[in-house]
């Protein structure tokens, strides 16, 4: 029953549909088509576009995946949450920079590793800078 229906569609209905399509003889004939003729061509052109896309899709470039999706790749991974506490009174320097990219070799202090991270990932992270207020 099902195969008979499929055979009827492929052998009878599809050829009849294609014969009724207003396909012009030349490229310039497309300019002379009426709106109703274009509307009759629309489903056929849509199916052709879909088949063309599905045929070309395997050859299209893949979306570029970010090199590393995790932020913290190596610092204190044994802890469920990394917290660094710094007493403000202990800031003897006039200015201190702290890492926010998790790439610093001297974590929590910033060593400029974010520059390489930004270059690789297209990110724009920078350090947290604390400085004493000048009186």
UniProtKB/Swiss-Prot annotation:
Keywords: 2Fe-2S, Autophagy, Deafness, Diabetes mellitus, Endoplasmic reticulum, Iron, Iron-sulfur, Membrane, Metal-binding, Mitochondrion, Mitochondrion outer membrane, Transmembrane, Transmembrane helix. The chain crosses the membrane at residues 38-60. [2Fe-2S] cluster binds at residues 99, 101, 110, 114. Its cofactor is [2Fe-2S] cluster. Belongs to the CISD protein family. CISD2 subfamily. Homodimer. Interacts with BCL2; the interaction is direct and disrupted by BIK interaction with BCL2. Interacts with BCL2L1. Interacts with ITPR1. This is CDGSH iron-sulfur domain-containing protein 2.
